Every structure is written in C-alpha cells, then in structure tokens.
C-alpha cells in the first residue's frame, strides 16, 4: 500500500488540481472512523417482535434503535405532543396549549419538557440524534403562509384583545413582534434545555434549514432547484437557532413525480447545499454536522426508490459532506407481515447494497485522502462526483447461513482510483486536525463546545 501511496502523491503533485477552497473544520463523527452514517428512524418494531421479520439493518451498516423502534439510544424524535406543552393546531383542527406561543407559559412548557426528556431519554449519556419535529408553525412571521396563516390571524386577534385602543396598523406590528419573540423563546429555550440535560446528543429541529424549492410541479423543465434568495435571507435571520443547534436536519424526501428525473437531483442538491451553507455559518470553531432526512420509499407511497434515486438521495448527501442520512418511515412499513417482507426484500436488494457501497467508499476516501482525520467532500459542490466503490476494483458479497447474515466488501484501490478521488474530493478535517490531508494535529484548534 505504501508504494501506491507514494505513486499517488507524485501523480497528484503533477495534476495540481486542488482548487484552494477553504473548508471549515467538522465535528468528529459520532462513531470513530465512520465519516458517513445511515440511520433508521421508522416504527418497525412490529416486524421483528410480532411478525418475526428481521430487516437486517445492522447487516447493511445501518444504525438503529433497539428492536428497530422509532425512538431510542441511536435516534429519538419528539413530535408535538411528546415534548412540553407545544402550542399549535393539529391537522384535524384541534387546539392545543393556547394555540400560539405568546398565549402559553414558557415556564410550564420547560418544566414539562424536562420531565418528558427524562422519561423518553433516561440515559444521561445519550449520544444519539435528538430531533424535535415541530412543523405546525414557523418562528418567522413571514413564513407562516398558507394553512399556517392562522397563527398570524390568531396573533393579531390576541394583540387586539389586549390592546383595543391601538390602531390596526400598530396591532399588526405588535402581533408580529410578540409572536416572533415568543416563538424564538419556545424553540431556543427548548433546544438549550435538551442540550443541558443530554449534552452528548446531536440536537436540532427537523426540516431546519428549509430551502422552499418545491416549485418542480409547476416549473417542469424550467426548474432549477435553487433556493429562492428570499428564503436564504430568511435562513440567515435564524442565526440564533443555528448557533444553539448541535446538528441540522433538512429533508430530501422525493415525491413520485420526481422519480428518476433530473429535477430530483436538482431538488436534493440545492437543499443540501443550503444546509451545508448554514452549517458553516452557525459557529466559528466547526461546521455543524448535517443529517439529512430521507425516505426509502417515495413520499406518500410504498414504492421503493429507484437505483438512480438512491444515488440522488444517499449518494448526493454523502458527496456533499453531510455527516449522515436518516431514513424515516411510517407505520405502514410494519402494518402487516407482507409490508415487513417488502421492506426486508428492498433492504436485502438495492437499498442495503447501495448503503454498504457509499458508507464503505466514504471510509476508504477518509482513510487514503484524510488519514482518517477528516471526511471527503466534493471539491466542486455542483459536480457529479460521488463516493462510490469502484466496480472494477471492489465487490460486495452477502453471506448468510441459519444463524447470521453478513456483508463483506472485497477489493483494493488502484492508482487510478486514488487519482480520481484526489481530483474530485478534498478533506474536511475534524476538529484538532488541519492541512491538505488533515495530517497536522493542533490541540489549540479544539475549542470547548
């Protein structure tokens, strides 16, 4: 291996393809030498316990909770009624906890949240993903459009009831100010409480940041996938949220209308690009880890992603430098023995093999380019370079017997493979490491979080 490395360095000096882009340091991965992780966040406990169907998640390098449950030590997701007294209106029109944040006690909410966190995550050394899924309203007034406009209307009425002497213009301005102040307090203080109680967890809000690039249904061939500038500006205004987050959880769910299309890649790419931008501006010492939420099946269906769309979601997420991807799923996955078998078949076929492909390729790239002290990131984010095992050099083999199933990757990198990686990828060093290949250790670069 040493002589190949020397040849590789010589070839690279000749190529001189590094484009000089500065990459902010990253937080070290959750698990040592695992630069890209795949999580399972679907309620499939019944597949194992009731139907005796093992989805083989660990076989295919997928991190999951005990018994493949929705929440546990690997990843815990908090829905609206699971954490504190979150004020909102649900999808059926039911009112909860004062409806708007300025009409509910923050102290009451935090006290209840503390109890909920202790109950749902009893382990104080929790080291997994802590995801708060609050989607009913957004903390910025101008983003509460469509069905969320009710929160603006309720806020205006709330201000009017308290200050009937004010003009309508002043009432509206006051309503916006009070709403945004209360919304910020609810989201920020909840996050800080969770981080104080379980400081080793990776905490953030699901779907933050968003890109609002959903116009593929109307633009057709004219669709670019780019985040509107106004939405990027609004994301900039949420710096208070990014600074207090310890992870970001955008989503890259694909609707079936995007199946195997150029628009699917545009959609995913720009959502990830925005998340990586926010990750780099949130802190001064390191970029926040990004874990993109995806679905193994097209949204609102039980149709598995095509091979092309696995590349679009999993492959794109890894190549852009995210820390991992989280597969979310519905109760439909475990509703019957047939549905469990369908998930298992997909896992043992294209899905599982592709996950092994990407996670292994990411580890190899980290080892040969970054000395295991960083992860590989595309040099040019808009390129079509992916972290894939080279088919001429590697094989993925699945072995199974009556007691176990395991996946083995066989092969070795050739010189041309190394050159390809160096031409197309660069290192994002973990905290404490620097240099083109993350070869220099510097304790002063590690700051206390």
UniProtKB/Swiss-Prot annotation:
Could you confirm whether the keyword Acyltransferase appears in this record? no
Residues of the EGF-like domain:
427-438
Cystines in this chain: 47-340, 211-227, 365-376, 370-427, 429-438
Q: Does the keyword Transmembrane helix apply?
A: no
PROSITE patterns, A to Z:
EGF_1, EGF_2
Which major enzyme category is it? hydrolase
Reactions the enzyme catalyzes: Random hydrolysis of (1->4)-linkages between N-acetyl-beta-D-glucosamine and D-glucuronate residues in hyaluronate
Cell compartments where the protein resides: Secreted
Which Gene Ontology cellular component annotation is one that this UniProt entry carries? extracellular region
Q: What is the lineage of its organism?
A: Eukaryota, Metazoa, Chordata, Craniata, Vertebrata
Protein name according to UniProt? Hyaluronidase-4
The record ties this protein, via Gene3D superfamilies, to: Aldolase class I
Quaternary assembly? Monomer.
Q: Which organism is it from?
A: Cerastes cerastes
What the protein does comes down to:
Snake venom endo-hyaluronidase that degrades hyaluronan to smaller oligosaccharide fragments. In venom, it is not toxic by itself, but increases the diffusion of other venom proteins by degrading the extracellular matrix. In addition, it displays antiedematogenic activity.
Q: Which domain of life does the UniProt lineage start with? A: Eukaryota
Name the coiled-coil region(s): none
């Amino acid at each position: 291996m040493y002589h190949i490395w020397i040849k590789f360095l010589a070839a690279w000096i000749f190529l001189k393809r590094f484009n000089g882009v500065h990459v902010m340091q990253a937080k070290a991965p959750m698990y040592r030498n695992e630069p890209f992780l795949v999580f399972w966040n679907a309620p499939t406990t019944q597949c194992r316990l009731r139907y005796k169907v093992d989805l083989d998640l660990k076989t295919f390098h997928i991190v999951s909770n005990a018994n493949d449950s929705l929440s546990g030590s690997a990843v815990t997701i908090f829905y609206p009624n699971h954490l504190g007294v979150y004020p909102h209106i649900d999808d059926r029109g039911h009112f909860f906890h004062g409806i708007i944040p300025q009409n509910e006690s923050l102290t009451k909410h935090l006290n209840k949240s503390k109890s909920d966190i202790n109950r749902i995550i009893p382990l104080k050394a929790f080291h997994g993903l802590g995801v708060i899924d609050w989607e009913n309203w957004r903390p910025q007034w101008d983003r509460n459009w469509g069905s969320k406009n009710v929160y603006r209307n309720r806020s205006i009425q709330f201000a009017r009831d308290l200050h009937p002497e004010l003009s309508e213009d002043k009432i509206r301005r006051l309503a916006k100010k009070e709403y945004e102040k209360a919304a910020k307090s609810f989201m920020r203080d909840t996050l800080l409480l969770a981080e104080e109680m379980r400081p080793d967890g990776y905490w953030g809000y699901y779907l933050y940041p968003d890109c609002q690039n959903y116009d593929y249904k109307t633009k057709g061939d004219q669709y670019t996938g780019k985040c509107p500038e106004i939405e990027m500006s609004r994301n900039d205004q949420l710096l208070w949220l990014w600074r207090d987050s310890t992870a970001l959880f955008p989503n890259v769910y694909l609707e079936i209308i995007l199946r195997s299309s150029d628009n699917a890649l545009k959609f995913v790419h720009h959502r990830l690009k925005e998340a990586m931008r926010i990750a780099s501006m949130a802190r001064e010492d390191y970029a926040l880890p990004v874990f993109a939420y995806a679905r193994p099946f097209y949204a609102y269906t039980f149709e598995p992603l095509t091979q092309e769309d696995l590349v679009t979601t999993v492959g794109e997420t890894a190549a852009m430098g995210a820390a991992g991807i989280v597969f979310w799923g519905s109760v439909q996955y475990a509703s019957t023995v047939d549905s469990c078998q369908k998930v298992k078949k997909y896992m043992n076929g294209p899905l599982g093999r592709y996950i092994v492909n990407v996670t292994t390729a990411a580890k190899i790239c980290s080892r040969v380019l970054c000395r295991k002290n960083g992860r590989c990131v595309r040099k040019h984010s808009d390129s079509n370079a992916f972290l894939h095992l080279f088919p001429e050099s590697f094989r993925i083999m699945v072995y199974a017997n009556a007691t176990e199933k395991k996946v083995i990757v066989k092969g070795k990198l050739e010189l041309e493979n190394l050159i390809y990686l160096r031409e197309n990828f660069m290192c994002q060093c973990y905290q404490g490491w620097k240099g083109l290949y993350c070869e220099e250790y510097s304790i002063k670069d590690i700051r206390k979080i």
